[in-house]
């Protein structure tokens, strides 16, 4: 695949579980078909929304294989494959590549609070270990560290397979620095559904979306409209779904989105600890909004 394929509407896929907490492979296959039919450009299993910290390496590889096989070339398959140990992150990236992932989404090393040089070296080792494109996942609200624009651009300049960043913050100064300084091969994606419109208006390349789990066609239309310069249509879609986007984070992701998908009859509402169901009040608000949108 080309690095230029890392654009458009990408879904941060949930991992469906059975009541015994095993992977619900039937539901997983149906989710992949749902996204293929909706026109999703990129499907990303085993990320934060997929409860990756609760998956063992064998489960991650199995999920990637299933998604790859069911996607049948209709969507690009990028897989979450990151952790805070560089050695383990390299192993996960290799395993994902071996399982058929066409790109890797690798989260910044969390908890350790490394220096920018430590972050650079972390991604350098991953880039040298795999041949597929790598998406840097910068989510300072979860990791406790920010991958600076300078570090991201340094990596993009030094390694041809450092192909994109998922910028999951509202730091528009950093976003502008990335968009202005990036090399031609490098994509900048937002990880914030509520910011799709302003992000795309600045010249961003797309979104890695939680809301695409429940409204993939709408997210795809929003991204495509903004990319085509049809801002009036993009504003209409953004206004329609803005409250839903907000409610998907009323509690820690992925609890609200899995609750929503269970309401839609697409998965069972089963989580692996420490993730637990949302409160009754959050459930009520989600239900009201989804009913108003005709989703349930």
From Swiss-Prot:
GO biological process: diaminopimelate biosynthetic process; lysine biosynthetic process via diaminopimelate
SUPFAM superfamilies recorded: Aldolase (SSF51569)
GO molecular function: 4-hydroxy-tetrahydrodipicolinate synthase activity
UniProt subcellular location: Cytoplasm
InterPro entries: Aldolase_TIM, DapA, DapA-like, Schiff_base-form_aldolases_AS
Binding site for pyruvate: 49, 208
Domain of life, source organism: Bacteria
Site residues, Part of a proton relay during catalysis: 48, 111
HAMAP family documented for this protein: DapA
Protein's job: Catalyzes the condensation of (S)-aspartate-beta-semialdehyde [(S)-ASA] and pyruvate to 4-hydroxy-tetrahydrodipicolinate (HTPA).
Designated name of the protein: 4-hydroxy-tetrahydrodipicolinate synthase
């Amino acid at each position: 695949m080309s690095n230029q394929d890392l654009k458009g509407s990408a879904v941060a896929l949930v991992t469906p579980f059975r009541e015994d907490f095993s992977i619900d492979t039937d539901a997983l296959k149906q989710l992949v078909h749902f996204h293929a039919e909706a026109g999703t450009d990129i499907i990303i299993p085993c990320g934060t929304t997929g409860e990756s910290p609760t998956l063992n390496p064998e489960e991650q590889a199995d999920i990637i294989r299933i998604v790859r096989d069911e996607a049948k070339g209709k969507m690009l398959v990028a897989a979450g494959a990151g952790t805070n140990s560089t050695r383990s992150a390299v192993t996960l990236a290799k395993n994902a590549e071996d399982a058929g992932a066409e790109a890797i989404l690798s989260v910044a090393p969390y908890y350790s609070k490394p220096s920018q040089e430590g972050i650079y070296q972390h991604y350098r080792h991953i880039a040298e270990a795999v041949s597929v494109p790598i998406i840097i996942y910068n989510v300072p609200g979860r990791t406790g560290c920010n991958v600076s624009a300078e570090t991201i651009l340094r990596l993009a300049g030094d390694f041809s397979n450092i192909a994109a960043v998922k910028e999951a913050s509202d730091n528009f100064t950093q976003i502008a620095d990335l968009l202005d300084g990036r090399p031609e091969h490098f994509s900048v994606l937002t990880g914030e559904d509520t910011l799709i419109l302003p992000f795309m208006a600045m010249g961003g390349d797309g979104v890695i979306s939680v809301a695409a789990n429940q409204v993939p066609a709408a997210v795809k239309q929003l991204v495509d409209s903004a990319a085509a310069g049809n801002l009036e249509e993009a504003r209409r879609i953004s206004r329609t779904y803005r409250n839903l986007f907000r409610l998907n984070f009323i509690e820690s992701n992925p609890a609200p989105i899995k609750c929503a998908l269970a309401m839609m009859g697409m998965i069972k509402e089963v989580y692996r600890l420490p993730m637990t169901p949302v409160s009754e009040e959050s459930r009520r608000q989600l239900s009201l909004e989804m009913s108003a949108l005709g989703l349930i």
